[in-house]
Every structure is written in structure tokens, then in C-alpha cells.
């Protein structure tokens, strides 16, 4: 199965004072560069969902805008999946600096077994570290047109395979590998992790 890696870079970064969080430098590279470096080895191609392509041109990757602007993360996931050259899209956020290829492989190993393959950590489904098949598109579109934007809102209409937390934990601390940098406090924590653990 051909799988496209999709980096979601459509957020407004309002909690970071408007500075695009993906472009913040951490450990000598911009966060989005760490994201691409983590997923590129395990997918067939990578694209970026963004409404500001000029900011991400330096990556040299295909870029697509939101099909449904201002429809939140579900709109971004839909746009990336629709544009994906593969039969499925491995979707990640642009602000996850500690993503790891080996953790991604746990998800991708189950490609073809379900329409959504997604890790669960406690009560949280990691919707921005998940594999979505093209079979999800009509169900996503119906929710988007109805303005029902909760990502998991269409899950009861497709086959979902959850990856147990302990599978992730065998390789990495889920609190680190799935960490988002949404706020200045989270950025400070990421810098501390970078200093203490390196790569």
C-alpha cells in the first residue's frame, strides 16, 4: 500500500503570539524539519497542508491548501488525505518535535487492516499521529459540510484499529513522542528535553 505522509501546518499559532510554531528553531533545526525527518523514511512521499505556502517553500515539498478553509484540524486532515498520492495518509502535526520513525512504523505496520489506525494513550486518541485511508473521505466530507468538526466524529462510520499505549511505550515515552508545542510553556519544556536528552 502506498502511503503519503501529511504534515498539518494550517494552524494560526495564536497561543504562540502569532509566530508559526512549526518554524521555531529547536536543537539547530526548525520544528517542522524534525517532523519531516522523522516521517520521510517510513512513507512513500510527503506533502504539507498549509494556507501560507511561502513559509514552507524551503522544505521543497508539495503543498496543498485547505479544501474547507477555517474547518479546523478535521479540514486539514481531509485536505491532506484528498491530495495524497497514496491510498492512505499518515497524518502528523507540524509542531511535534520529538516524533520518531520507529513509533510511526508501529502505526504503519497495520496499514490496510482498518480505515483509521491510531494510537491510544490513556483516554486520548492521537488523531495527529494516525493513518487515514481514502475510504474515510466521504465520511469526513459529510461532517465538514455539516460543520461537525470533531475529528473522531466519523469514526463510528469506518473501521478503526487502536494501537495500545504499551506498544508505543516499549519504544518511547508517549508524553514526549506525541508532544505538541502549542504554548510558550510547552516550548520551554521542549527546549529542556532537547538539552537533557539530545537526539
Residue ranges of predicted features:
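Nucleotide and nucleotide-moiety/phosphate-recognizing core
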Residues: 1-148, 156-175, 188, 192-198
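A residue-level signal for conserved active-site and pocket-lining positions in enzyme catalytic cores
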Residues: 155, 183
